[in-house]
Amino acid sequence: MVKRGKKTKYLFVTGGVVSSLGKGLAAASIGALLENRGLEVTHLKLDPYINVDPGTMSPFQHGEVYVTDDGAETDLDLGHYERFTSAKMTRKNNYTTGRIYSNVIQRERRGEYLGKTVQVIPHITDEIKAVIREAAGGVDILIVEVGGTVGDIESLPFLEAIRQMKYDVGEENAVYAHLTLVPFIAAAGELKTKPTQHSVKELREIGIQPDLLLCRSDREIAREMKDKIALFCNVDPSAVFTALDVKSIYEVPLSLHKEGLDDKLAELFNIWSRAPRLDKWEQIVQKVKAPKHGEVRVGVVGKYVELHESYKSLNEALVHGGIGADVRVKQVFIDSTKLEEGDLSELNQVDAILVPGGFGVRGTEGKILAVRHAREHKIPFFGICLGLQMAVIEFGRSVLGLERANSLEFDEQTPHPVVTLMEAQKAVADKGGTMRLGTYPCALKDGTKARELYGVDLVQERHRHRYEFNNAYRAQYEGAGMVFSGTNPELNLVEMIELNNHPHFVGCQFHPEFKSKPFAPHPLFAGFVHAAREQRDQQADRRAAVTKLPVGKNV
């Protein structure tokens, strides 16, 4: 519902020179600063690829697919927005070229353009402007991040649309922020501004004059160099800011505030706001950089480990768990396909094992080996989505003796389909946007670790899957000691499992990483990291006891 009585102001964030400069983090950090000044903020990500959404894209190409409460499969930057601010993202907060064109084509088929020739301008650009206004929803500030790099042909309709927006809403209601790179050339021993100058030149040729520049650099940019950038880019010298490389992403809001970015935005928007309250951000950064209880090593066993962006929310949720336990989490990425070769030595070097979500049969046997290692050696274990299914399969094979127990996803001929296709999925033909997506309730069983960690009887968690535990095997599993600690109250689907004869063995069918924040670590991640810390301390105590044995003592 659009709120009345407010006129939304728009901040458009673009990027130049190279990709992966951190526009999403910059946008999220600006959102955090403005929110801490008492303003209501939300975000919109515009992605220039033709896919309708990233749901069917390879993690190696796109990175993580972030799932919202309403079941949208979106860009991972929406995760940054939710973690850094209190804004709730929905399908309205992420649009792709494919989705924009699909909307326009559907309207054309319905005859809504009254026989006109449908063109990029005005029809595509008008649709882009319409979704921008819809995403605003009456907040104080809408931060719009335009994906890609200025100069990419795919981005042109979006850039034209945001160019028009300034004239639609007025000068004081639209600000353009451009993120560029100011590289340090070691051979010359100095920073170079030419890439930034060319990037801004390209943006101005499109018709957009940036109001402020965020200059990404691995070192402070001197005032003289900022003045030079301002001169050649036609920007006020007070609107050129260093976007400094930092050790933790949670330092970015503090770094930008130190540069005076939020003050400048308040000036450009001509909007009153209070001084920001950043104490909690300073506390978080302190815990991340100097935890009281040292470091734990968590093995993340997956098949997308070469690209850490594939597990972005999970990586951050582990950091949040570390904040809660006042410990640094060192993530050790373990390729599950290599475990299948028989060398499990990497699993002996970690304090806890996590098997995240995934799709496809490749690497699954390695994940099952990791589950067995964690179960038999009493190493804290956490299985998410596919990780729960791997735990169920391993338990069926090793404990129940169900030979060739498997998921129907991987072996349609298995004699023991302990993981099966959900009933609602059996008639589904299309791949895109058809999984069990979004938030569903999970009822927790009294006396379980899950109930203890959450502290409530009913929780709401986000899902992204087609397969589930086969309830036909439920009695067998319970008889052998597996506890089904969480179920969907409407369909009786298994949502959580655990083992009582283990220090910490928990699996969940949902994705708790999507609801974790630095100021509110998710209970399952907080509990898991705490268990890893206890495991580390117990191992240290055992090693200390061995070193203190008398010489010649037989043990």
UniProtKB/Swiss-Prot annotation:
Mg(2+) binds at D77, E145. It holds the Pfam family CTP_synth_N. Keywords: ATP-binding, Glutamine amidotransferase, Ligase, Magnesium, Metal-binding, Nucleotide-binding, Pyrimidine biosynthesis. Allosterically activated by GTP, when glutamine is the substrate; GTP has no effect on the reaction when ammonia is the substrate. The allosteric effector GTP functions by stabilizing the protein conformation that binds the tetrahedral intermediate(s) formed during glutamine hydrolysis. Inhibited by the product CTP, via allosteric rather than competitive inhibition. The active site is at C385, H511, E513. Pathway: Pyrimidine metabolism; CTP biosynthesis via de novo pathway; CTP from UDP: step 2/2. L-glutamine binds at G358, L386, G387, L388, Q389, E409, R466. UTP binds at S19, K192, T193, K194, P195, T196, Q197, K228. One of its GO terms (cellular component) is cytosol. Catalyzes the ATP-dependent amination of UTP to CTP with either L-glutamine or ammonia as the source of nitrogen. Regulates intracellular CTP levels through interactions with the four ribonucleotide triphosphates. Homotetramer. Belongs to the CTP synthase family. This is CTP synthase. It comes from Anaeromyxobacter sp. (strain Fw109-5). The gene is pyrG.
